[in-house]
């Protein structure tokens, strides 16, 4: 087997472990809360602390990987993630579990920050899309299999086992990484590190994510503080020659446009992920298990489409594939915006199939297009930047749609029945999501540069 495919397998192990860990934990949270005798507002910090650390540090580890070697850092990430998993499994109270999750999150952040750049450097230009598409499919498999595997583990072995399963996989991955990951391409031009820029960026992202978990004045104060820190960061990065934010990369049109349309894809996804389970269980009266089956429709389609979309983008360029992707997502969200309480379930499933086509056709062509404009010695930074954008978009999308839906529902209940108010609030949310996707479509059509794959 050629080394590039071994490299891809090693990266996919890390992708699978990190996505599986997150999706399993969502299922295990109620069990852990009952075991520790705590409420759900307390157990949410097991998830929130992990998300804060990952999002705030990914860009740092991406840049660090370019300087010291992404392969070394990736292997270290596996080691830290594995040790963190062991510590989580041994936790006997909430504070210990949160501390262990923070340690584990450092490893996960390294894996997410450096993995995509390693894959991009390992494959030639005409195979990058296919390779990145395979990693996208693994993300979908991890997210889909998490609830199933988690349910089996919780029923037969208890919640510590959801962390124990990471340990043997992690040990194998560490040895594979040491033996097979290629010699790194280092960024020799800039060995210095913008520590103040790093601290400002980490503080800004942390405050944004904390604000998403608060309400009222606390959210407002955190948001204002985050804005002030962002302005300070912007002023510093413009004036400082060797800045933490790699501003020269934004001169590349596809790098800039690709990250902007990333927001237009990932932000609206949360309307579906957050609101749809409530629609299925409360308005369609489906059991949680049946609702779960319905919610696997679009991830399943995504798993099937992602590698195909990656291969097509290698042959025909990313722009046409991304145009189709946003068209599918916009159409599907408009369809969801037209659903009523008594709409047949098959109409929703059709919308989810179309939505899955759009999602599956997005990530690998867009990631490939972004990284094609990034020099080999900066691939770690490029991959970590788009991963940071993705995480922030998910967090902001969840906060926005949950808040908007709740406010719309409360307002409309003054004039309508609960069911009618629910449908109105849901439809309005999907119209907003569709509008954001349509903006992504416009940006793709008019601003993304069409690459000549034959030259690549």
Curated annotation (Swiss-Prot):
Induction (record text): Expression is probably regulated by riboflavin, via an FMN riboswitch.
Main location: membrane
Cellular compartments per GO CC: plasma membrane
CDD domains linked: MFS_MMR_MDR_like (cd17321)
Subcellular location: Cell membrane
Keywords linked to the UniProt accession: Cell membrane, Membrane, Transmembrane, Transmembrane helix, Transport
Transmembrane segment boundaries: 5-25, 45-65, 78-98, 105-125, 134-154, 158-178, 192-212, 220-240, 260-280, 289-309, 321-341, 343-363, 385-405, 428-448
Membrane topology of the entry: Multi-pass membrane protein
Entry similarity comment: Belongs to the major facilitator superfamily.
Summary of the function given for this chain in its UniProt record: Transports riboflavin into the cell.
Protein's name in the database: Riboflavin transporter RibZ
Organism, scientific name: Clostridioides difficile (strain 630) (Peptoclostridium difficile)
């Amino acid at each position: 087997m050629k080394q590039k495919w071994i490299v891809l397998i090693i990266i996919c192990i890390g992708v699978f472990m990190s996505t599986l860990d997150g999706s399993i934990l969502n299922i295990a949270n109620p069990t852990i809360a009952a075991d520790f005798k705590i409420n759900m507002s307390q157990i949410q910090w097991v998830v929130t602390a992990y998300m804060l650390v990952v999002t705030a540090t990914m860009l740092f580890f991406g840049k660090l990987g370019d300087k010291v070697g992404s392969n070394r850092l990736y292997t270290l990430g596996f080691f830290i993630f594995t040790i963190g998993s062991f510590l989580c499994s041994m936790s006997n109270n909430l504070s210990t579990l949160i501390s262990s999750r923070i340690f584990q999150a450092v490893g996960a952040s390294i894996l997410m920050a450096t993995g995509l750049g390693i894959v991009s450097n390992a494959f030639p230009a005409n195979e990058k899309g296919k390779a990145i598409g395979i990693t996208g499919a693994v993300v979908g498999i991890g997210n889909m299999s998490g609830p199933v595997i988690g349910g089996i583990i919780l029923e037969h072995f208890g919640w510590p086992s959801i962390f124990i399963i990471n340990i043997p996989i992690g040990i194998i991955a560490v040895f594979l990484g040491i033996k097979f990951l290629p010699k790194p391409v280092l960024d020799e031009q800039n060995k210095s590190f913008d520590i103040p820029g790093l601290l400002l960026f980490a503080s800004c992202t942390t405050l944004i994510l904390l604000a998403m978990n608060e309400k009222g004045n606390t959210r407002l104060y955190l948001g204002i503080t985050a804005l002030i820190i962002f302005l300070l960061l912007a002023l510093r990065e413009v004036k400082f020659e060797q800045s933490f934010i790699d501003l020269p990369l934004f001169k590349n049109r596809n790098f800039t446009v690709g990250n902007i349309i990333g927001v237009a894809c990932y932000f609206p996804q949360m309307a579906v992920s957050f609101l749809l389970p409530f629609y299925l269980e409360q308005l369609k009266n489906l059991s949680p298990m049946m609702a779960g089956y319905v919610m696997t429709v679009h991830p399943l389609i995504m798993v099937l489409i992602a590698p195909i979309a990656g291969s097509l983008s290698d042959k025909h360029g990313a722009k046409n594939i991304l145009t189709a992707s946003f068209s599918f997502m916009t159409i599907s969200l408009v369809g969801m915006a037209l659903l009523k309480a008594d709409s047949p379930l098959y109409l929703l499933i059709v919308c989810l199939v179309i939505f899955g086509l759009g999602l599956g056709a997005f990530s690998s062509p867009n990631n490939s297009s972004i990284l094609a404009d990034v020099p080999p010695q900066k691939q770690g930074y490029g991959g970590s930047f788009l991963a940071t954008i993705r995480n922030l978009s998910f967090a902001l999308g969840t906060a926005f749609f949950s808040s908007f839906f709740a406010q719309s529902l409360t307002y409309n209940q003054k004039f309508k029945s609960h069911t009618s108010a629910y449908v109105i609030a849901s439809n309005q949310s999907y119209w907003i999501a569709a509008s954001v996707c349509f903006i992504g479509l416009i940006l793709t059509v008019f601003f993304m540069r069409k690459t000549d794959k034959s030259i690549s």
